[in-house]
Amino acid sequence: MDLIKEFERLIPEIKKNLEQASSLEHIEQIRVAFLGRKGQLAALMSKIPSVDTSLRPVVGETANSVKNQLTQLIHEYKTQLDFLTTTNRIQNFDAGLPGKRPWYGTLHPITIVLEEICSVFTSLGYTIATGPEVETEYHNFEALGIPSEHPARDMQDTFYISDSILLRTHTSSIQIRTMLKKQPPIAIIAPGRVYRRDSDVTHTPMFHQIEGLVVDKNISMSHLRGTLTAFLKTIFGAEIKIRFRPSFFPFTEPSAEMDISCHPCNNTGYVKNEICRICKGSGWIEILGCGMVHPKVFESVGYDHNIYSGFAFGLGVERIAMLKYHIEDLRIFFENDLRFLRQFM
């Protein structure tokens, strides 16, 4: 009958279409056209109810047979085309070409500088000390001789958790904890995160600091000067110029600040006849604070200042990194921009 012939006609027709298929996508289109819900086979099967009852079993059997053959043909052509595509891809593949290089992770520039600084001091015999970031007022302020009326203890500058608990504003608190637990001689550096309520192009609420402490008999300012000069020349190069100038810190006496010569302007204060933006025309860049440990600090930890003396210093790791890598905006360190971070691979 005519309906059976229409079913059987689908087999040579789909073969013709499959032989012309050039991609797996094209074969999928053919499958939908013949076997889809609105395809040719479905259209013919919708006519079966109108066939004479006695002929329906034969027509139904033919429809199922044709459907199975169509499915098998599609599978065979799809497998064959997939094999040919893979074979061509392999034949055209040049095994001698270099592969695509994946992006490798690397240390953050702050971590690089932090480890470099620690390496310099450990090579000089210092040990690394650590302490809690959530501190007491005693360890963070009082034991260091910072009185209650000092501006640093104001709510505007310090993150307070309670009346006497705060986020440490410097790692000097580690120095206090170390001296309370250990008798001299002491030579430590205390790296870590510290927190202050400040945020602009040169300040962030959280930053990294390294403080150092040396305590022993007959420690003098010359030991401080020699140690820090050697450190700065190792970090920035032997040609760097260094100067000490008087300063004030509650926990050291005498106190000083160290400056290094400004590299962009070569210590002149000017770049192309314009005032240097880095050093503001002075030719010098403040790099760290230091001084001899104040006798009151020794008293607070039970050391006899008539027997022992020592020096302390502190520096910001981000500031060192900014100068070392010529970065003007501190905040870029914390933006996780891969374009920036990949420069340090």
Curated annotation (Swiss-Prot):
Cofactor(s) required, per the database record: Mg(2+)
SUPFAM superfamilies: Class II aaRS and biotin synthetases (SSF55681), tRNA-binding arm (SSF46589)
Assembly, per entry: Tetramer of two alpha and two beta subunits.
UniProt-recorded name of the protein: Phenylalanine--tRNA ligase alpha subunit
Annotated EC: 6.1.1.20
Compartments, record wording: Cytoplasm
Record CDD domains: PheRS_alpha_core (cd00496)
Binding site for Mg(2+): 253
One CC-aspect GO term: cytoplasm
Family assignment from sequence similarity: Belongs to the class-II aminoacyl-tRNA synthetase family. Phe-tRNA synthetase alpha subunit type 1 subfamily.
Entry note: cofactor: Binds 2 magnesium ions per tetramer.
Record-linked NCBIfam families: pheS
One Gene Ontology molecular-function label: magnesium ion binding
Gene3D superfamilies given in the database record: Bira Bifunctional Protein, Domain 2
Gene source species: Lawsonia intracellularis (strain PHE/MN1-00)
Gene Ontology BP terms: phenylalanyl-tRNA aminoacylation
Catalytic activity: tRNA(Phe) + L-phenylalanine + ATP = L-phenylalanyl-tRNA(Phe) + AMP + diphosphate + H(+)
Sorted UniProt keywords: Aminoacyl-tRNA synthetase, ATP-binding, Cytoplasm, Ligase, Magnesium, Metal-binding, Nucleotide-binding, Protein biosynthesis
